[in-house]
Amino acid sequence: FMKGNFGFASTLLDTLKKHHNTCPVMLSSSAQASLTGRFGNSEYGRSKKAGEDLFLQYGKDTGAKVLVYRFPNLYGKWCRPNYNSAVATFCNNIANDLPIQVNDPRVELELLYIDDLVDEMIHALKGEEHRCEFEGLDVHPLVDGRYCYCPVTHKVTLGEIVDLLHQFAGMPKTLMIPEIPAGSF
């Protein structure tokens, strides 16, 4: 992970420095970079945190605008099962009558819908990104924060996700549409 995350970031920023290019740069990081809770021993998280630190230092050294996003779990169209989305994996497996594994249905995930991420990227391109500081996994909005965030996310347990997906899968048999309250994931 370190080579892919930190190594690429280092190569990119060194190249920009070499050519005196102070264009804005954005890093797609991960909630795992918090290195707190279940992410405390994450090699992936350490590599993402190293990339963040490199980008933030680059901004201080060059004056370039730096946007570091710590994205939570993404879901929605274009997510790939068994690769980048637990929700996509569950959808795929339930739709294809494959087993799913949930060790603890009470585990809460913070989900970010892909369209909400795209909306934030458009804001960032316009110079209207949402800035913050992080305390562990908690976002603290702050106009001059070092980090950026997507303001629309959804917190839900693994059990709730699986229950809802099973309800959708059962629709042809039950002819019932699951209740989807406003603002739900």
Label each residue range with its predicted role.
Residues 2-6, 41-49, 80-84, 111:
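Short-chain dehydrogenase/reductase
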Residues 7-52, 59-62, 66-69:
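Conserved Rossmann-fold NAD(P)-dependent oxidoreductase catalytic core, especially the SDR/UDP-sugar
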Residues 32-33, 74, 107, 155:
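Short, solvent-exposed loop/turn segments at secondary-structure junctions
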Residues 50, 54-58, 90, 161, ...:
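Hydrophobic alpha-helix immediately C-terminal to the catalytic Tyr-X-X-X-Lys motif of short-chain
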Residues 56-68, 72-109, 114-127:
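NAD(P)-dependent short-chain dehydrogenase/reductase
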Residues 123, 127-185:
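Mid/C-terminal beta-alpha module of Rossmann-like enzyme folds, strongest
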